[in-house]
Regions:
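Two-component histidine kinase catalytic core, primarily the HATPase_c
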Residues: 36
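Residue-level recognition of oxygen-bearing side chains
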Residues: 6, 25, 67
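Phosphopantetheine carrier-protein modules
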Residues: 12-31, 50-58
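C-terminal structural segments of small proteins and small subunits
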Residues: 54-78
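Thiotemplate assembly-line natural product biosynthesis machinery
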Residues: 1-19, 70-78
Length: 78
């Protein structure tokens, strides 16, 4: 399973009503809210065995799956 597939699977567990693969502006446009964001961070932490620090919790890191994947990759292996 690729990192992108793992990411999409984790996101689907949080919000299965959103097609994350084609979405941009997830936070900026209100597609996901603060509760979703909290659940997404927990799902990513668990799926990738990483810890996302509070300083990284900003809209630019969660507006698209590409942004989230870049965030995950920054913390893999740390």
């Amino acid at each position: 399973m690729t990192d992108m597939e793992k990411l999409l699977e984790a996101l689907k567990e949080v919000r299965d009503d959103i097609d994350f693969s084609g979405q941009y502006g997830l936070v900026d446009e209100g597609v996901i809210d603060s509760l979703d964001l909290t659940q997404i961070i927990a799902a990513l932490d668990e799926a990738f065995d990483i810890h996302i620090p509070a300083g990284e919790i900003e809209p630019d890191n969660f507006n698209s799956v590409q942004d989230m994947l870049a965030l995950v990759r920054r913390y893999q292996g740390k």
